[in-house]
Amino acid sequence: MKTPPSPPAPSKTLLRWQRAPLQNHLHALMPQWGGQALDISSQDLASNASFVNYVRHHRFTDPNTGKPVEVVEKSIRKIAFIGSQEARFHRAEGMLAGSTQFRYPACLGVIETPWESLIFTEFVRGKPPRMQAIARQLALGIAELEDLGQAWLQAQPLGKAPLLWSMDFFRPWFLLRPRFNFARCLPGLAQLGRDDTQFAGLAERFEAFVPLMRKLAGEARRSPRCFSHMDYLRKNLFVNKGQLHLIDWSEVKVGRVGFDGGAYLGSLFRRKDMGVFLAAQSEFVEAYREALAERFDEGQALGNLRYVFLLTALFHCLRPETVEEYRERERMGMLREKYEYLLGACL
């Protein structure tokens, strides 16, 4: 991992009326270079996030020290001149200060134009972890992140209330997304039951989750707020010298305590066999309960964890693409096992 040897400009959010060459942006963020020429090599990185124009890895040499510098630039297009959640999060200076469990790439700055947000962060190298093997590490990091986020939100002036309100998980523009509406998949499950007798009658049983999820959402809405990363996938985590690095805040929300644990376990449930999932779930929940800050109610946090776990697991296990994937791999028995777990352990 290479980091810029000198601090960026005092304010890491810069406003521009139009896009400028990359070198101009870097000089604006790092004024100590005094406009000296930079020999930059760039490489596009993979990205499938909504509204992302591109993600690029830039390499160049610090003209003052001669040391190598590696920076990631992410361009996120705006809709109706409204910036992205991720750009707003990176403008929340100091929120991650004091973190000891996770490591985060330093944000060098955010450049806002009317049409896009450009986010510049340090480049992180490391080995992607086996997600079930880091359950305890994640539990400690998530508990710390929730504590830091809640403290930061409580310290904000009233003038930031509209911005934070717009980032809240319970705004309609988030809740209407397909991934948070598993009930849309029930007609497909009913058809699956007609085609395959081992799935007969399951759609009617899964309908019981509709009122349950409404109840859990109401309880979660009233619980303590914090920042929630919401995207604990292998591609967003790296291990470097024993430290766990968390990147990519494209799904960040003003969430609730417990949400990130549910997001992690929901993703694990979607991808792993039941034995692997159950072992990791037990390890995660035990460590999370121990690490949870005293300011939070344990029962409330675990209830919120259950809510987001179900949101994630129900949609990803019921959607037609998942059913087809299991059919092609001849693993419909495993899918049926996951359905039984959801119906038996979660209702």
Predicted regions and their residues:
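Active-site activation/catalytic loop segments of kinase-like enzymes and analogous catalytic loops
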Residues: 258-295, 309-337
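Active-site catalytic-loop/activation-segment of kinase and kinase-like phosphoryl-transfer enzymes
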Residues: 160-216
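Membrane-interface aromatic/basic loop that binds lipid-linked glycans or pyrophosphate carriers
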Residues: 334-347
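Juxta-kinase regulatory segment immediately upstream of eukaryotic protein kinase catalytic domains
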Residues: 2-42
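Short Pro/Gly-enriched beta-strand edge/turn motifs at strand-loop
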Residues: 33-42, 89-93, 181, 210-222
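Active-site acidic catalytic loop and adjacent metal/ATP-binding pocket
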Residues: 46-65, 212-259
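ATP-binding pocket architecture of kinase catalytic cores
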Residues: 63-164
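Acidic, serine/threonine- and proline-rich low-complexity regulatory regions
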Residues: 293-305
